[in-house]
C-alpha cells in the first residue's frame, strides 16, 4: 500500500510562504495514495512557472518541459506507455497564453490523462505580470493602468472545445480537490481541473479572502452530464463555481479512437518498439559531430 512518504524526494519546495500551490501538491499526494498508485507508475509532467516546479517535488517519473509545452510532452508519454498514470501541471499563463494552442487541441483530442492548472490569475515566476486570467482593473508591471481585457473563461472554453471532464476547485477545500482528482484519474479521456491557487506575493486582489467571498459550490442535484446546464451555470456564476462541472462518458478516448482506426490496439507499449543502436553505430553517429 502506497503512503505519502513514497512520493517524497529530497528537494524542498521553494514556493513563497502562504502560496496556494502547497495545497495542490498535498491534494495530489492524497489522491495518488488513495488510488494506491506506486511512484513507478506515475508520471508528473510540467511546463514553466511557479506551478510547474511541482514536478520536481515528487518522487516519480517526470519531465520539467518548456514554456507552454507540458501537454505535448504529457500526451506523448501517455501514448508511448499507456500503463502510466500521467498528470500534467501548468499555471494559467503556461496553459492559457503561450500554451493555449496545445491546450485547445488537448481538450478536443481526449487523450486519457489528467491536466491540473494552478490558477492564480498572474504570472508569478517572472514577478507579477497580467495573465489571460487577470481581472479587469488588475494593476501589474505590464498593466500599470489596470488590465482592460476580459479574463478568459477557461471552463466554458474547455467545454466548447470538446473536453469530456471539466472540474474546478479551490485548493483550500482539500477534500473536494482530492475527490475531483480521483474522479479525473478514473475518467477515460482527458480530464481538466482548474484549481484556484492564490499568489500571496504578486496578486493581492484575488486573495484567500476574495476567493472565500466569491466562490460558490454547485447546487445539490446538479447534473454534470448536461452540457447546456454546465455552460449556463458557468455564465450565471461568472465562472466562479467549484465541483465537477461537466462530464461526457460517451466520447471515446484518443487511444480507443486510434485503435479503432488502426484495426485494433498496438500489441505492446510503444516504449518497447524503440530501436536502440549497437555501440558501433552509436559511436559512428557521435563521430559525425566531432
Q: Which residue stretches match the model-derived regions?
A:
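Short, solvent-exposed polar/charged micro-motifs at secondary-structure junctions
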Residues: 52-56, 177-180, 253-256
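Thiamine diphosphate
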Residues: 1-124
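Beta-strand segments within the central parallel beta-sheet cores of soluble alpha/beta enzyme folds
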Residues: 41-47, 88-91, 117, 169, ...
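Short glycine-rich anion-binding loops that position phosphate/pyrophosphate groups of nucleotides
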Residues: 49-51, 93, 197-199, 249-250
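Generic structural signal for well-ordered, non-membrane alpha-helical segments
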Residues: 17-25, 66, 147, 151, ...
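Flexible, low-complexity linker and terminal segments
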Residues: 10, 199-290
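Glycine-rich ThDP/TPP pyrophosphate-binding loop and its adjacent helix/strand module
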Residues: 97-114, 118, 122-242
Amino acid at each position: 500500500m502506497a503512503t505519502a512518504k513514497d512520493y517524497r524526494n529530497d528537494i524542498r519546495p521553494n514556493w513563497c510562504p502562504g502560496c496556494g500551490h502547497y495545497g495542490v501538491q498535498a491534494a495530489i499526494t492524497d489522491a495518488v495514495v488513495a488510488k494506491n498508485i506506486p511512484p513507478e507508475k506515475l508520471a508528473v509532467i510540467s511546463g514553466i512557472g511557479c506551478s510547474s516546479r511541482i514536478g520536481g517535488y515528487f518522487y516519480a517519473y517526470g519531465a520539467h518541459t518548456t514554456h507552454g509545452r507540458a501537454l505535448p510532452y504529457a500526451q506523448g508519454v501517455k501514448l508511448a506507455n499507456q500503463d502510466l498514470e500521467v498528470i500534467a501541471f501548468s499555471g494559467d499563463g503556461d496553459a492559457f497564453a503561450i500554451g493555449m494552442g496545445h491546450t485547445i487541441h488537448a481538450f478536443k483530442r481526449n487523450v486519457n490523462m489528467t491536466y491540473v492548472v494552478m490558477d492564480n490569475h498572474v504570472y508569478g515566476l517572472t514577478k507579477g505580470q497580467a495573465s489571460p486570467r487577470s481581472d479587469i482593473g488588475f494593476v501589474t508591471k505590464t498593466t500599470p493602468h489596470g488590465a482592460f481585457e476580459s479574463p478568459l473563461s477557461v471552463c466554458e472554453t474547455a467545454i466548447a472545445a470538446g473536453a469530456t471532464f471539466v472540474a474546478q476547485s479551490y485548493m483550500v477545500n482539500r477534500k473536494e480537490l482530492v475527490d475531483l482528482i480521483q474522479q479525473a484519474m478514473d475518467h477515460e479521456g482527458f480530464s481538466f481541473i482548474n484549481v484556484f491557487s492564490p499568489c500571496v506575493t504578486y496578486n493581492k486582489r484575488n486573495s484567500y479572502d476574495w476567493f472565500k467571498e466569491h466562490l460558490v459550490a454547485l447546487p445539490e442535484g446538479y447534473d454534470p452530464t448536461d452540457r447546456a446546464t454546465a455552460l449556463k451555470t458557468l455564465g450565471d456564476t461568472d465562472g466562479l463555481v467549484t465541483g465537477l462541472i461537466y462530464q461526457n462518458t460517451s466520447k471515446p478516448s484518443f487511444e480507443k479512437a486510434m485503435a479503432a482506426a488502426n484495426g485494433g490496439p498496438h500489441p505492446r507499449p510503444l516504449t518497447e518498439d524503440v530501436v536502440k543502436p549497437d555501440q558501433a553505430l552509436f559511436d559512428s553517429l557521435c563521430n559525425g559531430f566531432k
